């Protein structure tokens, strides 16, 4: 009987957790001072609340998207070109905006960046990247190649 309940519990987790992972988590929104755009889906914001000796900046990775890599991380010339375009799009969107906010969800799986979204004049950067073809939805599954 214990094995039965364990199997039912395991099956429940297998069905529920993937669905939960794709939902947008609850976050906290703050006004943001954007320091720089690292790439299409990573933006560095000022974080003066961090204690010394930490650098007063946080890298925010846009939750739920994958943009092409650029530079040495690109797998092919096409991905590098697309990565440069995604970065340019993000830079332009930030530069044109007058109200910048960040929604923070938590640390990414590696702990070096915070997962979140950037809201520019009331519009989600995540949505803008996907809508304009510079990003794909991504929730941890195997990534699709940008090289085809």
Predicted feature locations:
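Intrinsically disordered and other compositionally biased segments
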Residues: 6-7, 94
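Small beta-barrel nucleic-acid-binding modules, primarily SNase/OB-fold domains
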Residues: 17-148
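Bacterial N-terminal signal peptides
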Residues: 7-16
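Positively charged n-region of N-terminal signal peptides that target proteins for export
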Residues: 1-4
């Amino acid at each position: 009987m214990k094995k039965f309940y364990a199997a039912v519990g395991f099956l429940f987790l297998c069905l529920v957790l993937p669905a939960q992972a794709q939902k947008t988590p609850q976050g906290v929104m703050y006004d943001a001072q954007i320091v720089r755009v690292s790439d299409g889906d990573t933006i560095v914001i000022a974080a003066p609340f961090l204690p010394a000796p930490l650098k007063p900046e946080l890298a925010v990775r846009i939750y739920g998207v994958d943009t092409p890599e650029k530079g040495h991380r690109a797998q092919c010339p096409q991905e590098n070109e697309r990565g440069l375009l995604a970065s340019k799009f993000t830079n332009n969107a930030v530069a044109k905006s007058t109200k910048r906010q960040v929604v923070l969800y938590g640390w990414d799986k590696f702990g070096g960046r915070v997962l979140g979204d950037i809201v520019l004049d009331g519009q989600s950067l995540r949505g803008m990247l996907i809508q304009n073809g510079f990003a794909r939805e991504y929730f941890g599954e195997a990534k699709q190649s940008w090289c085809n």
